[in-house]
Amino acid sequence: VISRKGAQFACIDIKNFYLDTPMEDPEYVRIKITDIPEEFILEYGLAGKEDKNGWIYFEIRRGCYGLPQAGILANNLLLGWLEEEGYYEAHSTPGLWRHKWRPIQFCLIVDDFGVEYVGIEHFNHLLTLLKKYHQIQTNMAGDKIAGINVQWKFPGRWVRIDM
């Protein structure tokens, strides 16, 4: 970023990345009614729905935390959307993405994007694409990505990174 004339840096975080991902086939889980908080039992009308051994059965249709395939399903969907819009992963650097012709590149860490761009319209192109599918949060100062604090001085062409 500091070596590219006119470049800026911003961060994008996809909210509920795994939770928004539809699954090709549903999964099933059973949970003891005694392990479910009373407030959830009341809110979802679960009282009396348990079997004779106290189990309640659920069908999972969207990704959820703890589901082994949730990460790969979410990631595959995201990569497909990016590729459809002209983004591609750099051959030499896994996790670094570029666009075929736009002056933009980003590192992708699960659901966090560290975006270098020249011209806000190119950043907005990526932003619009992601907003089609997910709720997102942007950090235009680009001062925090994946738990890393970043200090930028673009005119002085220096950056400080700390954790």
Question: PLM features: residue spans?
Answer:
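Long, low-complexity, charge-biased intrinsically disordered regions
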Residues: 1-163
